[in-house]
């Protein structure tokens, strides 16, 4: 098996089915690609019926307790057979063949540990494929959209988002996979950091020549629960990696208050444009 795709689903089976149908349509590895769906949904909202509607030949469905995004991905990784594991969100939609090229990139470069591709919004405008690592600078927050638009990825201070994270399986398993103490957010930068620490020559690549749609687009969900998850992960990750998490908390709090102030002064249409 060349590539194993692991998809952690949480409710919303229709979106998952669109994802699976696009994978089937643009599968250029045929039976050398497998798909593993890990279902973190509540028992009464499982997505198994949608998975059964897919015509993908090599597909596994695994119901799981919701212990977090990283933990769900680990469930899939443990049963995967591929040399490369692709962790993708259920709200991605393929618009072209990508797997043969990604696999070729890993085969050609034995130091390649992680690869991501360009994420587009539903209207095909540039989305967010990568972010700055543990950022505490306002200018980076304001310019990250431009960096993504131009495809300017710097592996020294950026990380590929977990919406499309392709990793070399042996390296991933040798650093004990995702940290399951992180429920959501920062798990991709954490595993990238551990891989680079264990493998000094490991490389992270952003392939801007390949693309897929990410329906979520910009991070517009500001619910209190998700904000708390993000902050809990941010503090845990900072402590774990001996970063100045107190400075990070002050920065994020100040930036959050600033955005709330700006949002109170602009129209709803401008708010949508701003968050995208």
Question: Which positions does each model-derived feature cover?
Answer:
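Non-catalytic, C-terminal membrane-associated alpha-helical segments of glycosyltransferases
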Residues: 223-276
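Glycine-rich, basic loop-to-helix element that forms the pyrophosphate-binding segment
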Residues: 64-80
